[in-house]
Each structure stands twice: as C-alpha cells, then as structure tokens.
Amino acid sequence: MELLLPHPSNSTPLTVLGFLDRAASVYGDCPSILHTANTVHTWSETHNRCLRIASALTSSSIGIKQGQVVSVVGPNVPSVYELQFAVPMSGAILNNINPRLDAHALSVLLRHSESRLVFVDHRSISLVLEAVSLFTQHEKPHLVLLDDDQENDSSSASDFLDTYEEIMERGNSRFKWIRPQTEWQPMVLNYTSGTTSSPKGVVLSHRAIFMLTVSSLLDWSVPNRPVYLWTLPMFHANGWGYTWGTAAVGATNICTRRVDAPTIYNLIDKHNVTHMCAAPMVLNMLINYPLSTPLKNPVQVMTSGAPPPATIISRAESLGFNVSHSYGLTETSGPVVSCAWKPKWDHLDPLERARLKSRQGVRTLGFTEVDVRDRKTGKSVKHDGVSVGEIVFRGSSVMLGYYKDPQGTAACMREDGWFYSGDIGVIHKDGYLEIKDRSKDVIICGGENISSAEIETVLYTNPVVKEAAVVAKPDKMWGETPCAFVSLKCDNNGDGSVPVTEREIREFCKTKLPKYMVPRKVIFQEELPKTSTGKIQKFLLRQMAKTLS
C-alpha cells in the first residue's frame, strides 16, 4: 500500500468557494439575500453577481493580481456578503475592515496590508477619503463605491473611479474563478480587534477557512434552507465563517445595517428567522428591551466572545432564544470549541442549564486538540475544574501566522507544536473547557490570582446591573485589587427613584464572593466602552483605574 500516493484526482485543494457553485445548482431559485424591499436575490443571481465581480477585478482596467490584497469597508449589506466570495474567486486575498475605525487606524491597516483596492460603503466615504489622504499618490489604493440602499448621491462620490454595480456590468458571468493551487494558499487577512493591544494581521488559508466553516455547520446542526439574520458583523472573523456556510446549506441571508433590539425583533417576526449569531452584548440588549415579548417560534443563537453570564443566557432562553456557546479566536479562524449539549442536562433547572452553557465546551468536529497547560511546567493541568493554565490549540483552522510579524508568530506558535492563546482556563472532570480570563485580565492581589470573569458573573446576577467589567487597580499594599465598572438598567431598582450606591454593590458581592475577591472600588458609567463587535475594551478601563490609584 505504500505505493499508493496522492493523485490529482484525490488531492484537489479544499476551499469554501465551491459552495457557491453548488448553491446555484441546488438552491438556484431559492432566496439567497434579503435586505430592503428592493433587494431580493436568488442563489443563481448571487452566483452570477460574484463571478462578474471576480472577473472585473482581474480585468486590465482594474488589474488585481493573484495574491494581492483587496479590502472591504462596510456593514452587513448584500454587496459585502457577495465580496466574501468574489474577492478570493479572483485570486486576491480578502481583507474585511471594521467601518467604525477612525481614519488614522484605517490608514495604518491599509498601509500594513498593502491593499490595492478598497470597496467602500457609501456611509464610510468620508472616513476612507480621510484615511487615504495620508498616503502618497503612488500608495493610494483604487476605490470602489458600494451603493447598497443609497438614497442620495454624495458629493464625495466623485472621488471614486467606479461603483460596485458599474464594475459588475463590465464583468463576465461565465468567468472561471481562480482555484487555489494549494489549500495552504492564503485566502483572507483579518485584523484582530485590538482590545488588549495593537491590531495584528492574521493570515488564514483556504484549508483553515474550509475546516472552520464545515465544522461550524455540523457542530450547530444547521439544517438546509435556514433563515439566517446577520447581527454578527461580517468583518468580524468573516462572520465566524457563516458568510460561506450559509451558501453551503442554501440559507436565506437577512442583511441589516442596524443592530438594535427593535430592528432584531422586527426582522425575526417578519422573516421567520431561525438562526443568528450574536455577541453577549447583543443578548444583553435583547433581554433588557422593555417591549420584548416571547418569540412566536424559537430562534437558534450562537454566541461567542467574552463568557456570557448564566443569568443572561437564562433570560434569553425564557424569551425563546435557544442559546449555544462557542469559543475561538481570529487566529483560529473563528470558534473551534463549543458547549456540546448532553441530553441528561435537559432536566436541570434553567439556571443550572444556563451555567453549563456558559462554559466553552469541547473541540469542534473538524479541530484536532485543545488543552490547558500549566504556564510554569508546560504540562496539562488536572481535569478538576480548579487547576488553571493557558489554553492551547492545534488544528487545521489555526492561522498561517501574523502578516509581517515573525516574532509575534513565533511567540504564540511555538516549537512544541501548539498555538498559545493567552487565555486562562480550566478543564472540568467531564472534559469541558471553561475560560477563566484573559491572561492580562487576571488580578494578582497579595499573591492570590483573582479571575475578573468570576466577579463579573456575580455582578450580572444583581437585578440592577446591565453591564459589568472588572479590572486590576494598582495598590501599594496588595499590588493589585479588583475595580468594577458597572452600568445600570434604565429602571434601576424598579422606578429609578432610588440611586444605587457603590456600597450596595460591594455588599451584594460580599454575599457571593470571598472577601479578597470583592471589588474595592465600583465605578458607575452610563455605557461601558466596547469594540464594534461587543467586546468591552478593558484596556481603556485599566487606564481609568490607574488614574484612581
């Protein structure tokens, strides 16, 4: 058997781009994208439009070459969805960028990525023009205007050589899209959200994206023809892979610019939404909406990011949201760990079920291995739910590396064959992983390691608390002490007439936490600072805490 070797017939590179060809064949007449009353596409139309854009990018008039970077600055609108396929189909590397960045940060990413072309949503025109004004004429990328649901022509649009629909008209729907020569070929360049440090460029291969996407569909048991609501930004880890996954199952993609409670509830009711992904912030927003009522039909929700407190999951499920929890990083292409549900948990009380769901879980089907290693010895910690260590990964969807940063790559992709996440966690007796904190979020008070996430979980059980984040505050005697930042619900204690005090919050924590874990300081804010994907920006809170010392 040793003479049986790989052959071109059995070793074609894995890529998600073929999902669109199949969707056009199997689900051609089915709706692919719904946005406004005037934007309804079928999978055949979406396939046709993506091929036209890919063809236009490679034309002599635009001249994008294989391996060059093409950036997209826009929200969850149809053109941005199409570009998730069209850009890599042209042989270029897809680079989604957060449209809520400021001009300086955007210019840094465009320069670092060496982007040759930028697709720009019409509401981000001034932002992008300010960013590229910092470039020399030779450095400036080609700009193409995305005009989804644009009502009025903008005077700034004259700075754009092309519009999306114009270059599509020039494209060829019979274009033979450019398949990767190897599945290890880069497909996307994503920048980390920068909640703890400067953003890093994460390069992901066709293989990584394929394995992540298929695993996500299997792990969530996504059926054929679901109705998927885009509340998760497509620019955030490519919408965790569902930008391509929805094509694999012939889903109807419901696109929306606005992500607020009234809009979400309205779209769920109007389109009979079955699935959506949401950061814990969005769940928190939905459960605190004063006019919320139980859903007519259950909606499957996948959440990821900061560990959602059990109370938020429990309240969401009481409204009809069936919450699943996953965990991953930009560097792992998206979620690679999920809280796989066990039938024996069905009979537990709602809060206990929610507590189990708030754990991160076990590796997804397409991933190889997840472990928790002692940071001093490098050995696996005991599976006792108590022994903490750093969470490490290895599997097909781990990044190729950080773009132009070999030192940063070597620091986390180490010679022992593991990717080191920087997250702190435990493994329970049943083998399920639970994050305790980011390594930078652990508070060392008098030599004791304190998990900020544990304190936050307690704070969320207080009925007046809407948002909570705990960081280290420098202390001359103890080194560091816990400092809590809290925002309150609008109705406060019921009628809003009685203010909540710092002492009351601390006394509440004393009933549920050891004394050394009780926040020494509580700061009230109307809203905690967040990234556009809902992550609380703890580095800003740390800076505030330092000024209190």
From Swiss-Prot:
Swiss-Prot/TrEMBL keywords: Fatty acid metabolism, Ligase, Lipid metabolism
Gene Ontology molecular function: any one: ligase activity
Gene3D superfamilies tied to this protein: 3.30.300.30, N-terminal domain of ligase-like
Cysteines joined through disulfide linkages: none
EC class (word): ligase
A GO biological-process term: fatty acid metabolic process
Tissue distribution: Expressed at low levels in roots.
EC number: 6.2.1.-
Record bears the keyword Transmembrane helix: no
One family name in Pfam for this protein: AMP-binding
Keyword Transferase (UniProt): no
InterPro entries documented for this protein: AMP-bd_C, AMP-bd_C_sf, AMP-binding_CS, AMP-dep_synth/lig_dom, ANL_N_sf
Main function: May act as an acid--thiol ligase that activates carboxylic acids by forming acyl-CoAs.
Family: Belongs to the ATP-dependent AMP-binding enzyme family.
Protein name per Swiss-Prot or TrEMBL: Probable acyl-activating enzyme 10
